[in-house]
Each structure stands twice: as C-alpha cells, then as structure tokens.
From Swiss-Prot:
ARM repeats lie at residues 169-208, 211-250, 751-790. This is Protein unc-45 homolog B. The keyword DNA damage does not apply. TPR repeats lie at residues 6-39, 43-76, 77-110. Expressed in eye lens tissues. Expressed in muscle (at protein level). One of its GO terms (molecular function) is Hsp90 protein binding. It comes from Homo sapiens. One of its GO terms (biological process) is cell differentiation. The lineage of its organism: Eukaryota, Metazoa, Chordata, Craniata, Vertebrata. It comes from the Eukaryota.
Length: 931
C-alpha cells in the first residue's frame, strides 16, 4: 500500500515539476521517500529531488540527493550529471570534472557532456593559474616589506597590493599561512601612517567572512590596541580601524555569510565573550579624554550598528540590556557635553547626535515596561545627580543631557522634563549673563517645545525671556537659535488653525526674518541652517508657506543650501520637512463628521483646517515650487551619502515627490529635470512608508511617460520591483491601480521588460486584479495582461493544464465594459495567434465561447471588432474540424456581412480581416465564391 502511495506521490511531484512549482515537487518527492524501500524508486526520487534543488539553487541539497542516487546505482547517468552541475555551482570544480568524465565514458557521443568537460577543464586551469600567481605575489610583497633597505615607495606599493590580496580568499589565506599576521603587527609598530593604514586595511580584508581568522587576528592584535588606533585624530585611520572592527564583529556574530568567503577549516569556540569584550572597550572609549572626536564618532557608529536587534522578531535583546547596565551612564555623559566648557571631551559636530540616536535605538530595543522603567531610572538618577546650586557647569551638563534625550526617545525625554526643576532650570539659564548658558538653554527649549503642553509652559514662562535675548544679544549663534525657539513655539499648534500660539501676524514676521537670513550669503552655512530649521517649524502655518513659495530668491537660496549641504544631515532634514509642509504631503487624519459633532457637544477642542490648506492653494504652491527648480534640488539631495541621508529624510523626500507628481500635466517637467531617476533609490531603500510613497510616485510617472526617457538605460529594470510591490492587496486601491498602469506601459516596451516583470512574480497579482469587482482595477489588470501575453513564459502558463487563466480571458471578452473587452480580446488574439493548442483549448473552457466571439465580431467599437475577427481567423487557421464548426454557426453570416462592406479609411483593417477569414474558409472548401 505504501509503495503504491509512493509511486502516486512521485507522479504528483513530476506534475508539479512540469508546472515549474519546484517547492511543491520537492515536498512530494520527500514524502514519497519516507514511504518506500524499493531501491529503483528511491534512486529515481533522489535524482528527481536533485533536479528540484538545481532549479531552486539549493546546490548543497542537490549534490547530496544526487550522491544518494549514485550510491544506489553507480551508473545513474542523470544523477551523475546533476551532481556535476551542483558541484560546479559550489565551486568544487575538480569533483565536478570527475563526474562529467564518468558521464562521457558512459555516453561518449553526448555533446552536452563533451561541452561540460571542455568548460570545466578551462575553469580548473584558470583557477590553478590564479592560485600560483597569488602565491608568488604574496611572497614578493613579503620580501619587499621585510627588507629594511627597500625604497619607501616600493614598500608602500607592496603594502597597498597586500590590501587587494587580503580581500581575495586565496590571497587572505596565503598571507595568513605565511606568518602574515606577525608581519602586519610589525607594520603597525612602524608608526608610519601610510604603512599602518595599509596593515589595518589588509587585516580588515582577512577578517571578512572568516570566523577562525577573525578570532586569531582579534587576539593577536588585541582589542585595546585596535581601540587606541581608532582613537587617533586622523579621520581616514579612524574609519579604517572602524571597518576592521566591523569586519571582526560580523565574522564573530555570523552576520557575514558570504558563500565564497566562508570556507572555514578550523573549529571556533563560542564568540560571545569576545563580542562582549569589544562592546565593553567601545563603551570605555566614549568617556576617555584620550579619544579624539573622530574616534568617539566611530565607536558610537559601531555601537549603533551592532548592539540593538536588527529584527524585533528575535527575542534576544541581551546585548542592549548589557549596554544599558554597563554603559548608559557613559552614553549620557557624551550627550551632556557642552563644547564651550573647558571640561568638555573632544567632539565633532555629529558626536552628540550619534549618541542621541544610540539612546533612541537602545530604548526602542527594550521589550517590556520593567526594562523601560530601569532605563528611565538610570537617566533620572544621572540628571538629578548633576543638579548642583554651587556648580553651574554641572547644571548645564544636566540640561544638555535632557536636550540630547529629547532628540532621541522623545517620550522618555518628555518624562524627564517633568522632573522637579528641569523646566525651571531651562528658563532660569535663559536669563543668565553667560552666553554658553543661554546657548544651551535656548537649544534645550527648542527641543522641549515639541509637545504642546510643554510649549504652553514655555510660552507662559519663557517667551518674554527669549524675545529679550533675541533683541539684546550680539552673538549671531544665540540670536538665530532664539529665533528658531520662537518659531517652534509659534508652530506648536501644528496645522491646527484654532491653536495659533502667537498673535495674528507674529509667525509671518518670524518667517520673514528667517527668509532674510536664508538669502544673506555673507552669513556662514551653519547659521543659515538654523534659518531653514526655523522655516521647517513655521511652514506648518499655511500663511507662512504661501508667502514662502512666492519668495523665489528665498526658495532658490534654500535649494542651493540643500545642494551644497549634502554633507549635513540637519540641512537635508530641515529642507525636506519644509517642502513636506509646503506641499501638504504629511499624513492627515480623516475627519469623521459625527465625531466632530460629538467633540463640539462635549466642549472638546476640534482641529480646524486653515483656509489656505485647501486643494487649490496646494496645487498653486506645487506649481511655484516646480517653477523655482525644486526637482534639481531633490535630485541632488537623493545623491547624498547614506550616513547623511537618513531613512526618515528619504521618507520626507518621497512624500514631496508624490505630491509633486499628483497632476499628470506636471510629470513631464519632473521627468525632464531628472525626477524619474532620483525616485528609484528612494523606492528601493528607506522606511516602509517612504518606499511605498516613492514607488507610488514612480507608478504615476511610469503610467504616462515614455520609459526610455523617464528611466534611461538599465535604470528602467530597477523600476519594476517597486511597482510590483505596490500590487500587494494591503496597499490602497489607487496605488494598485497606478502600479498596474505603470507596469502596462513598461510591459509594452520590450520583451526583456516583460521577462523582468514575470521574474518579479507579478503575474499572480495581475491575475488576482482581473477577478476584482472594481471596474478600473479590472480594466488596468486586463490591459497589463494583454501586454504580458507576448512573453513566452506567460504563454506557457496559459498552456498548462489545471487552471482557469484562459477561461477568465474568454469570459472578460464578454463583459459590458468596452475597455475591458478591448484588452481581453487583444490578449486572446495574441494567445490564439501564438499557439494552435490554445485555439482548441478556448472552445473547451466555456460553453459560451462562440456567443462571445460572435459578439466581438459585431461590436460597435472598431478596435474590439478587429480583435474579434483576428481571433476568428486564428481559430479557422488552427484546425479544419474547428473551422468547420465555425462555418456551420452564425459566424459565417457575420463574416460575410462584414466582408461585403465598402472599406473606408476607418474600417479598412476590419473588412480586410473578415475577407481573410472568408478566404481561409474557401481554402478548406467549406464555401465557394458566388461567381
């Protein structure tokens, strides 16, 4: 009984394999293997499962299954060949060569085996040549580096060549085995920057993807020495050592699983102790006065990247708990540094922001309330421990720490603002005579006033002080920060017209001053950055954004600042935020009228929309931004380095692009200025929301533009994946619809694009929307399928048995919607022209096929009628029996009536096709001419 079931499962697996469902086929073969002990059947099942492994690129599994089949029958030629293919992909060329040699012995005339032999022979020779040349290159470089008398430039060149070798598997292994680590340590001892740098980069290459080597190198060089090298002032050196540490961490934690690097031959013990030691040393670096600002930044970067979980589905957050317990106070110390104080640690412009990001990531990585409470208590103890009426510097550090936390986990920062004396201390410091105190206090107030309740406290207790500082201070740094503080307080009500914080016209005055500073080219970039930040807050007010987009010099000054500021993340974020506000592309909660009435009845505040936030005003602002050259600025911003262009900024840029693309008439301008190309990276990387918004903007452009112009060259293939992702049923209907329009346009360009769409597995989604009740979605999906059926692999899906694809297309030809009919008839015409089998299949899928065909051939719309007549011709040409059936029906009468019409310019194609159908009937002898 079990044997019979095993045979049935084998047959089922074969059917799945023919339908290219390799996963299901593998499952069927695996189940059959458990049920049988028949050696011949076992060999066949293993051999077939190996074929599935090759198709799914599971080469290790494929080689294993083929080996089991060969164990049963050593002359199983198919199993030998499949194992050979798998071994070739795994890089085991010598073993693959032996298998194909055996195949060629068993079947000497098989050309495939002979070709494989030749190819493998060439590959093996090439591999040997590289191997021997690598050996000699390593040896030569060692000789130059060891020779004290060799010229300096030769030694430097040899060291640089070592870097290249260290990145290759063969070279790295050769260096390692030729006592290379000891030699590289000698290079580190030379204290010559260029040689030390080369040694660090070589070690970095050797550690990548190889756990055993990474462990040996970590213990040989020692973590304290690596950290001391990273602590130097030289930015290039610090970055190189950071990369070395990252390579070691990746290898020890198993993050770096690159197949070609992972051929390890040593047993490695548990790496947790080493990883913990690295983390501990990085935390110590944060508070050491010996560490440069660059070194501190790199330590923070490493902690940011490696401590918090990358996937929150993983439950183990022990690394974060360890850092919170052993290093949170050290991170808080960095956040609380005040650059103007003599006790300040060496910092760069980014150090405090990186520390804030780390605090934010650690806080987000906590799993439960007790962990968050513990985190909060450490922060509270640290801040309250700093308050000292006798020591103003310590108070400054405390307020600066709160300011830094507010830039990280805002909820936590807001709780800390509630601590006794914190807000009062901020306001008190504003009144200090010392400029440093004012600077720290004003910045802290800026960050504190994000929440409306805090902003109200500051408006009540601190606005007069801020205005006083603004009027009296001579220090530009303080003046502009005070202005931003006032801007932020003025925008605390957000877009709610009913919650304006200042008197009518006050925010416009603040904005005018910001625009004035922005246009003043004599002011340094850093100060003008604060002007943009002020506008980022104030443009929540519709009066301000309307004035701003009319001020073309200010707009262009901001765009130039954005183009020049691609190395400053704050500028990019502020510009992006300002543009989001101007285009109203932020999320707006849907207002439910019943809830509004309820809120009014219960005397709750109801948000009011500003009159200038209506659609007409937004459209006018978009037109002005496009005219001022916003697209070229956005295109420059997108090119910024990934460390500067954060995922949040990318999301903001994607929102702006989507708002700009809303009107189809503007899309040509956007494409002409490079908007299409700029959108692609935004759709591929960033937050989920950002990627969806960018993909939607891409879909809008792809739907109406010539893809060759919008996405020139190979870029067009990168557009496909974001559009396919938009077909997800979780996305809203408009996104689905415009993605289908974009894919329709792309699939009409070339077969290579159709193949790309097919490979991205868009077909099931397109078919799904062809079933949709929504008329426009169904029409768009059918039009897309009409283009896709030109691709050979799509046609094969229609040819396969056991599905209703063809039936659906035939039934859609009978729909009342002319556009759906037109698209479905086009698809059916191309399918029946491509395969005679589909002509016969069409008559079997539904009993209504003839009635539907007759309706198409009599359709009022000439394009639909023409497609119907082409289908009729394809059926007549496919098979004599089928042609006879058609002639015996009313279709002959329809063809005769259409064929007898006088062909004018519009009807020429229709009449000509009908006449070709009649000629085909005459060729069969079914009808004869009248005379």
């Amino acid at each position: 009984m079990a044997e019979v079931e095993a045979v049935q499962l084998k047959e089922e697996g074969n059917r799945h394999f023919q339908l290219q469902d390799y996963k299901a086929a593998t499952n069927s073969y695996s189940q059959a293997l458990k049920l049988t002990k028949d050696k011949a059947l076992l060999a066949t099942l293993y051999r077939n499962r190996a074929a599935c492994g090759l198709k799914t690129e599971s080469y290790v599994q494929a080689a294993s299954d083929a080996s089991r089949a060969i164990d049963i029958n050593s002359s199983d030629i198919k199993a030998l060949y499949r194992r050979c293919q798998a071994l070739e992909h795994l890089g085991k060329l010598d073993q693959a060569f032996k298998d194909v040699q055996r195949c060629a012995t068993l079947e000497p005339r098989n050309q495939n085996f002979q070709e494989m032999l030749r190819r493998l022979n060439t590959s093996i020779q090439e591999k040997l040549r590289v191997q021997f040349s690598t050996d000699s290159r390593v040896q030569k470089m060692f000789e130059i580096l060891l020779d004290e008398n060799s010229e300096a430039d030769k030694r430097e060149k040899a060291a640089n060549n070592l870097i290249v070798l260290g990145r290759e598997e063969a070279g790295a292994e050769k260096i390692f085995q030729n006592n290379g680590v000891a030699l590289l340590l000698q290079l580190l001892d030379t204290k010559k920057p260029e040689l030390v740098l080369a040694a660090v980069r070589t070690l970095s290459g050797m550690c990548s993807g190889h756990q055993a080597r990474a462990t040996v190198i970590l213990h040989a060089v020692r973590i304290d020495r690596i950290c001391s090298l990273m602590a130097v002032e030289n930015e290039e050196m610090s970055l190189a050592v950071c990369n070395l540490l990252q390579a070691i961490i990746d290898s020890l934690s198993g993050e770096d699983k690159r197949e070609h690097r992972g051929k390890e031959e040593a047993l490695v013990l548990d790496t947790k102790k080493d990883l913990k030691q690295i983390t501990s040393h990085l935390l110590d670096m944060l508070v050491s006065k010996k560490v440069s600002g660059q070194g501190r930044d790199q330590a923070l970067n490493l902690l940011n990247k490696n401590v918090p979980r990358k996937d929150l589905a993983i439950h183990d957050n022990s690394r974060t708990i360890y850092v919170v317990d052993n290093g949170l106070r050290k991170i808080l110390k960095v956040v609380g540094q005040v650059p103007d104080l003599p006790s300040c640690l060496p910092l760069t412009d980014n150090t405090r922001m990186l520390a804030s990001i780390l605090i934010n990531k650690l806080y987000d990585d906590l799993r439960c309330d007790p962990e968050r409470d513990h985190f909060r208590k450490i922060c509270e103890e640290y801040i309250t421990g700093k308050f000292d009426p006798q020591d103003m510097d310590k108070n400054l550090n405390a307020i600066q720490t709160v300011s830094g936390i507010l830039q990280g986990p805002f909820d936590l920062g807001n709780q800390l603002l509630g601590l006794k004396g914190v807000m009062e201390m901020m306001v008190a410091l504003c009144g200090s005579e010392r400029e440093t105190d004012q600077l720290v206090a004003v910045e802290a107030l800026i960050h504190a006033s994000t929440k409306l309740s805090r902003a109200t406290f500051i408006i009540t207790n601190g606005v007069s002080l801020l205005k006083q500082i603004y009027k009296t201070t001579k220090n530009e740094k303080i003046k502009i920060r005070t202005l931003v503080g006032l801007c932020k307080l003025g925008s605390a009500g957000g877009t709610d017209y009913g919650l304006r914080q200042f008197a009518e016209g006050s925010t416009e005055k603040l904005a005018k001053q910001c625009r004035k500073w922005l246009c003043n080219m004599s002011i340094d970039t850093r100060t003008r950055r604060w002007a943009v930040e002020g506008l980022a807050y104030l443009t929540l007010d519709a009066d301000v954004k309307d004035d701003f987009v009319q001020d073309v010099p200010a707009l262009q000054a901001m765009f130039e600042l954005a183009k020049a500021g691609t190395s400053d993340k704050t500028i990019l974020y502020s510009v992006a935020t300002t543009l989001v506000n101007c285009t109203n592309s932020y999320d707006v909660k849907e207002v439910i009228p019943e809830l509004v009435q309820l809120a009014k009845f219960s005397k709750q505040h109801v948000p009011e929309e500003h009159p200038k936030d209506k659609k007409d005003f937004i459209d006018m602002r978009v037109k002005r931004l496009l005219k001022a050259g916003v697209i070229s600025a956005l295109a420059c911003m997108v090119k910024a380095d990934s460390a500067i262009l954060t995922d949040q900024t990318k999301e903001l840029l994607a929102r702006v692009f989507l708002a700009l693309c809303d009107n189809p008439k503007d899309r040509g301008t956007i494409v002409a200025q490079g908007g299409g190309k700029a959108l692609i990276p935004l759709a591929l990387e960033g937050t989920d929301v950002g990627k969806v918004k960018a993909a939607h903007a891409l879909a809008k452009i792809a739907a109406v533009s010539n893809p060759d112009i919008a996405f020139p060259g190979e870029r067009v293939y990168e557009v496909v994946r974001p559009l396919v992702r938009l077909l997800d049923t979780q996305r809203d209907g408009l996104q689905n619809y415009e993605a289908l329009l974009g894919l329709t346009n792309l699939s009409g360009r070339s077969d290579k694009l159709r193949q790309k769409i097919f490979k991205e597995r868009a077909l099931p989604d397109i078919e799904n929307y062809m079933f949709e009740n929504h008329d426009q979605l169904r029409q768009a999906a059918t039009e897309c399928m009409c283009n896709m059926v030109l691709h050979k692999e799509v046609q094969e899906r229609f040819l396969a048995d056991g599905n209703d694809r063809l039936k659906l297309v035939v039934l859609l030809c009978g729909e009342d919607d002319d556009k759906v009919q037109n698209a479905a008839a086009g698809a059916l015409a191309m399918l029946t022209a491509a395969h005679k089998k589909l002509c016969l299949k069409m008559t079997q899928v539904t009993t209504q096929w003839l009635e539907i065909l007759q309706r198409l051939c009599l359709h009022d719309q000439l394009s639909v009628q023409h497609r119907g007549l082409v289908i009729a011709y394809n059926l007549l040409a496919a098979d004599a029996e089928l042609a006879k059936k058609l002639v015996e029906s009313e279709l002959l009468e329809i063809l005769t009536v259409v064929g007898k019409q006088e062909p004018d310019e519009k009807k020429a194609e229709v009449v000509q096709t009908a006449r070709e159908c009649l000629i085909k009937c005459m060729d069969y002898g079914f009808i004869k001419p009248v005379s």
